[in-house]
């Protein structure tokens, strides 16, 4: 089985919260696709709560589009990582890390402005697979933590995994 790009970086050296360009590609028609690693937590030291990350997923996707989409950028998808330390964001375009960090911080401020659970989008049995597993308070705590700590940049060249460690 081929080794995925996300497992070629040393998770023990990742900063968080931090933005990383995880992958870039060009489609046959010439569109640039960029995948960002939006790391909320330091891997193996912190983790996002299930209800918090789920609520954040519902809020973050819309808020990031509000702050980042434009004539040169269109978000395709924002999805939580299985390890619950962050999100992957795939988009058309090539915004830089600072543009993404600024949109992320603005989105976290928006999360703090949500007044109650009734304002969480798609919070119903028809649009959400586990609509009872949400916590606005936990999502807002995550947002507060990001704003308090700020968002830095993780560079792939600083995180390259030593090939000797790949066989462990």
Swiss-Prot record:
Q: How is the cofactor bound?
A: Binds 1 Fe cation per subunit.
Q: Name one GO biological process term.
A: quorum sensing
According to the UniProt entry, its GO molecular function terms are: iron ion binding; S-ribosylhomocysteine lyase activity
Return the EC number: 4.4.1.21
Q: Which reaction does it catalyse?
A: S-(5-deoxy-D-ribos-5-yl)-L-homocysteine = (S)-4,5-dihydroxypentane-2,3-dione + L-homocysteine
Per its UniProt record, what Pfam families does this chain match?
LuxS
Look up the record and name the cofactor or cofactors this protein needs.
Answer: Fe cation
The main enzyme category here is lyase
The entry's Fe cation-binding residues are 54, 58, 128
Q: Which UniProt keywords apply?
A: Autoinducer synthesis, Iron, Lyase, Metal-binding, Quorum sensing
Q: Which residues form the signal peptide?
A: none
The record's listing under PANTHER family reads:
S-RIBOSYLHOMOCYSTEINE LYASE
Concerning its family, UniProt says: Belongs to the LuxS family.
Q: What does this protein do?
A: Involved in the synthesis of autoinducer 2 (AI-2) which is secreted by bacteria and is used to communicate both the cell density and the metabolic potential of the environment. The regulation of gene expression in response to changes in cell density is called quorum sensing. Catalyzes the transformation of S-ribosylhomocysteine (RHC) to homocysteine (HC) and 4,5-dihydroxy-2,3-pentadione (DPD).
Could you give the subunit structure recorded for this chain? Homodimer.
Q: What HAMAP family does the record point to? A: LuxS (MF_00091)
Task: Report the protein name in the record.
Answer: S-ribosylhomocysteine lyase
Q: Which species does the entry assign this protein to?
A: Pasteurella multocida (strain Pm70)
């Amino acid at each position: 089985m081929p080794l995925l790009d996300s497992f070629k970086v040393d998770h023990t050296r990742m900063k968080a919260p931090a933005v990383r360009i995880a992958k870039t590609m060009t489609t046959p028609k010439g569109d640039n696709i960029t995948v960002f690693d939006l790391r909320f937590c330091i891997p193996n030291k912190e983790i996002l709560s299930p209800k918090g990350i789920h609520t954040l997923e519902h809020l973050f996707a819309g808020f990031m589009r509000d702050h980042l989409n434009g004539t040169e950028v269109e978000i395709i998808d924002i999805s939580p990582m299985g390890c619950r330390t962050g999100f992957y964001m795939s988009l058309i375009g090539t915004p830089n890390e600072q543009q993404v960090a600024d949109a992320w911080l603005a989105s976290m401020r928006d999360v703090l402005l949500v007044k109650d659970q009734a304002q969480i989008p798609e919070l119903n049995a028809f649009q959400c697979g586990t609509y009872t597993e949400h916590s606005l308070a936990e999502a807002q705590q995550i947002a507060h933590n990001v704003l308090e700590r700020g968002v830095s940049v993780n560079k792939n060249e600083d995180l390259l995994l030593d090939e000797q460690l790949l066989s462990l």
